[in-house]
Amino acid sequence: MQQDLLVYPDPKKQERYDRAYMRMAQEWSRLSHCTRKKVGALIVKDGMIISDGYNGTPTGFPNDCEDAQGLTLWYVLHAEANAIMKVARSTNNARNATLYLTHSPCKECSKLILQAGIKRLVYLNDYKDPSGLDLLEKGGILLQRLVMD
């Protein structure tokens, strides 16, 4: 693990914080109105939470994420995209930050993660298509799959 990307040099302390942030991302996922899959995201920089997000429809749209057949509507925003856009609207940025995700990102969101300057991704569950993780790995992002009790 690249030490310069970690806030805490003690691995045990870093793991405690990683788990705490992931539990918070899980809480954020519960705010999603999506029924098929609820995903939460947290962006942490220099030991501070600078953004959060969960999957859902754009502001002003009905909070219905799936169509009558239960398929996700094309315009539903992913949790990490919401979190990245939220920090982009602020006076802060995600450069050298850690992104905590309850599910690994899709390939489209992986491009956003790279462009945002995020350097570390901690995730809990695998997305069905691993190409997002492959892209992040090629881009030099430190990837860590967390196993929670």
Regions found by a protein language model. Give the residues of each.
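Zinc-dependent deaminase catalytic domain
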Residues: 1-149
